[in-house]
Amino acid sequence: MLKAFVFKPLSPFKSFPTTNTIFGAICWGIRWLESEEKLLETLEMFKTGRPPFIISAPLPWKGGRWIFPRPIHFIRIVPENVEDYKEYKKFKKAQWVSWEVFKKTLEREPERSFEEEKPQINKDVIPHASINRLTMTTVGGELYNEEVYWLSSFGVIVKFFDGSFEPLVKACLEFSQLGGNKTTGMGRYRLEETKPPEGMEEFISQKSTRAFLISDCFYDPEFDLNNSFYDIKVQKPAVENGLTKRVWKNTFCYLTPGSQVQVKTPKDWYGGIKEVLKEGSISVYQYGIGFPLFARWEK
């Protein structure tokens, strides 16, 4: 079962949400709307290789059109003049493409540069005054600025392997907020269900040995990295801890959305979730399950 949800922001965001931001919102929603036992049961399914669902990275949704991460592929381009070189640099900096461009990349091996599609993201600065918690005044405090993001609509694609989780995941996403500074009203949105990108399901069901990932993904032994094209991101983020104290996770790295991997065995998903922090009896997990779309041009 393939579902798509669109987030329509009602407030600024601390940062652009990631795959793990969405997964964290779902997990906290399960704990608050169901129970801690249901959350632990769900996490156990992910830990033992039986994920009830997988999610894409947040994808910009512009005027009813899906925007995807630029597919990473080696394209031999030899600039012949200054204009060609400028176009090549522009292509190298591109981060997003339309679903139509991404789909063409899945249908046949790309031989030329892609046309970039830019989502609308506006930065703003909010002034704050440090508060003296003993006197409950700003006396002695310092003025500082906080950078925030005003995002246009974005969405996620969810592939359900267990259909009973569909109403629960939707309820959790309707209930939650995303990202940091929730107590100051950031990360609010209205959730709407919509149609997945046209024709996407066939690139999930018709598998091959070459896949493009549309979510952050931990390394999988099934990857042949010598014959793959990918970017790696290293992070040490704060814990999505549901309005409680700030805790930092251990450092980890994963393949970014848009990465192209040669796989030994075609599967529904790759990677997994990892324990990135343990404090006493509390374990913190990071979502790193790769959502693959399979290319037709390699069997």
Where are these regions (language model features)?
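Conserved active-site/ligand-binding neighborhood in enzyme cores
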Residues: M1-K299
